[in-house]
Amino acid sequence: MGDDGLGRARAALAGAEVADAAAERYLLAHLAALRVAAAVLEARAHATPTGRLRNVWQLVGEVAPEFAEWAGFFAATQAKRQAVAAGVTAIVSHREADDLVRDARAFHDEVARRLAGARRRSWHSSEAG
């Protein structure tokens, strides 16, 4: 559960780490974070529609409160990501792009570690039953 999404996130991170342009690095790092968020939602979300629309970061904060700080951080980068995707590339410095790549990698690693731990606990509890 979530491995495919985390694999796609790792691929986006690998692309971000080798991209030359700051804007491309920024976009790929944000894409990686979105893919990690999708893996969290796949692992945790229950089909309980509330009737109101929410973005991925709101959902992550709701279904996995331990990642709420990450969700808030990446939600705060959303407007800049949209501007860069629309072609306003000069607003992202190399430093900002590097920082976002590093943050997306840290988010990925934390989610991967927690999901692996949850799978181990689930496997052990099913063995005991």
Predicted regions and their residues:
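Terminal alpha-helical segments
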Residues: M1-G129
